[in-house]
UniProtKB/Swiss-Prot annotation:
Name of the protein in question: Trigger factor
Ranges annotated as biased composition (Basic and acidic residues): 458-467
Record bears the keyword Cytoplasm: yes
Keywords from the UniProt entry: Cell cycle, Cell division, Chaperone, Cytoplasm, Isomerase, Rotamase
Entry keyword annotation includes Transcription: no
Cellular-component GO terms for this entry: cytoplasm
Ranges of biased composition (kind: Low complexity): 436-452
Annotated PROSITE patterns: FKBP_PPIASE
Gene name linked to the record: tig
Length: 467
């Protein structure tokens, strides 16, 4: 087999391939066998028809078609593997010549990874926010903990912000009942933002047994993007009484004996969270600085594919109804043209990022261990609420396992860059990135474990209190 590569642009090549017939004997053998199973000829059992008899019956054309359809994709991959190009996406293949008994020629045009020159990573400099835990933030955490152990008591007054209410809901669109919006005895905290727009304004000031109506725009379901007239009936109103902050509360809500110990722990937890946020901010800013310094030719077909994926994800909640999606965009104050422009901009940035990080991963010889891949799979499975086995099965069926591997590899490449960059806080102090990122994974695991233990203990105490 002979193959040559023509560079059409920095991101696209044409691969020309010539395959002599003497390399195709196995393909002809399989073609005769497959076609013999499909043809019934008197005097021969299925699959046992000699090649010359088969050709005399069906002609040479179907045999050549079978050989071409099987051999060309395989020979294309062979040509790619023997070249130095790194292909992206599917090729456009055209068979240009079939000379029976001599040669098959075809050409394949495909996007390729462009040559990218990256800067010295030590030259990258970014600044991130300081890590400072304020008393206000500690008190917010304390109030959230108090709320978990609060008690609800009925009140005889109009509903107000922060009250817990029981309500009945119904809605109509253009006079038609919206079945999925009908519910009774729904518990809701006014001001939590967990229900539809306008519900809080309708409930505040209402008295027990009162019914009110308001108009809102539905964001999901069959009527997404349409205005609905909603009727809400207020069944009951309760207010939450928070426990006093004293040593008794600390003992009830945590493993600590005093309020001072509890506050110290809350402050420490907030500090760990902020250090992780600082690390993520450093990562994001280094990536932005890196992209600003690198010239990246973009493979157009790869960009178009990324745009298609993003458009599909955007319109999917509207059952791929273009009209409903257009109405929703209008309600968001966005035109279709603006959406198209933003989607292209995001897609181009995503492709640019992938290409740069892949180049760095190659240069830094980044590898992904089985444990690292397993950790990512477990994390993704938890995000989507499925078991790791189910997630792997779905990823295999959709051909996404390779993408997961590539994503982990790119993440490792980026952190390699971040470690070599210069990162300072707002006062100009250089951060110890080895200390930050070297302990980050362990801190996250420790925090998750501590958080689980604290949650379990607090839940158990709350349950005991309820009993």
């Amino acid at each position: 087999m002979k193959s040559t590569v023509e560079h059409l642009s920095p991101t696209r090549v044409r691969i020309n391939v010539e395959v002599p017939f003497d390399e195709l004997k196995p393909n002809f053998d399989r073609a005769y066998k497959a076609l013999a199973q499909q043809v019934r000829i008197p005097g021969f059992r299925p699959g046992k028809v000699p090649a010359r008899v088969l050709e005399s019956r069906i002609g040479r054309g179907p045999v050549l078609d079978e050989v071409v359809n099987e051999s060309v994709p395989a020979k294309y991959l062979e040509a790619v593997n023997s070249s130095e190009v790194r292909t992206l996406g599917r090729p456009d293949i055209e068979v240009t010549k079939i000379e029976d008994g001599d040669v098959i020629e075809f050409k394949a045009e495909v996007d390729v990874r462009p040559e990218i020159t990256v800067p010295a990573f030590g030259e990258l400099k970014v600044s991130v926010d300081d890590v400072e835990v304020t008393e206000e933030e500690v008190n917010e955490q304390l109030d959230e903990l108090r709320a978990r152990f609060g008690t609800l008591a009925g009140v005889e007054r109009p509903a107000q912000q922060g009250d817990f209410v029981s309500i009945d809901l119904s809605a109509t669109v253009d006079g038609q009942e919206v079945e999925e919006a009908q519910t009774s005895g729904l518990s809701y905290e006014i001001g939590s933002g967990q229900l539809i727009d306008g519900i809080d304004e309708a409930l505040i000031g209402a008295s027990e047994g009162e019914t009110r109506t308001f108009t809102t725009n539905l964001v999901a379901g069959e009527h997404a993007g349409k205005d609905a007239e909603v009727t809400v009936k207020l069944n009951s109103v309760k207010e939450r009484h928070l426990p006093e902050v004293d040593d008794e509360f600390a003992q009830m809500a945590s493993e600590f004996d005093s309020v001072d110990e509890l506050l110290s722990d809350l402050r420490e937890r907030l500090g760990r969270v902020k250090r992780m946020q600082q690390g993520m901010q450093a990562r994001d800013k280094v990536l932005e600085a890196l992209l600003e310094t690198v010239e990246v030719p973009l493979p157009e077909k790869v960009v178009e594919s990324e745009i298609d994926v993003r458009k599909h994800d955007a319109i999917h909640p509207f059952d791929h109804d273009e009209d409903r999606f257009g109405e929703w965009l209008e309600q968001q104050g966005q035109t279709r043209e603006q959406f198209e422009d933003e989607t292209r901009e995001e897609a181009e940035k995503a492709v640019r990022t992938q290409l740069v990080l892949d180049t760095i991963a190659d240069a830094e010889d980044v590898s992904v261990s089985d444990n690292e891949l397993t950790e990512r799979i477990i994390y993704q499975a938890q995000r989507f609420g499925v078991s790791p086995d189910q997630y792997v099965q779905q990823a295999q069926q959709s051909g996404q396992l390779g993408a997961i591997y590539a994503d982990v590899r790119r993440s490792k490449a980026l952190f390699s860059v971040v470690r070599q960059a210069t990162v300072t806080d707002e006062e100009g102090n250089e951060l110890d990135l080895d200390e930050l990122f070297g302990t980050q994974a362990g801190e996250e695991q420790g925090e998750q474990a501590e958080g689980t233990e604290a949650t379990d203990e607090q839940s158990a105490k709350a349950d005991a209190k309820a009993e």
